């Protein structure tokens, strides 16, 4: 599906509540990080050194 997007959630040491869905993520942060494909997600995670703190990659 072309309308599918991938979202990431990160563990920021308990500062934010666990976000269970992309909708919660969007509402809490006002603008979620979203990507068109899994490759873009993985490239972003690696580029910014987020390997240890990413807790979820969600496809919707």
Where are the language model's segments positioned?
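Short, mixed-charge low-complexity intrinsically disordered segments
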Residues: 38-60
């Amino acid at each position: 599906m072309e309308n599918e997007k991938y979202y990431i959630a990160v563990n920021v040491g308990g500062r934010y509540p666990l976000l269970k869905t992309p909708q919660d993520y969007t509402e809490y942060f006002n603008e979620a990080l979203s990507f068109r494909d899994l490759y873009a997600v993985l490239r972003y995670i690696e580029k910014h050194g987020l390997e240890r703190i990413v807790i979820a990659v969600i496809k919707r």
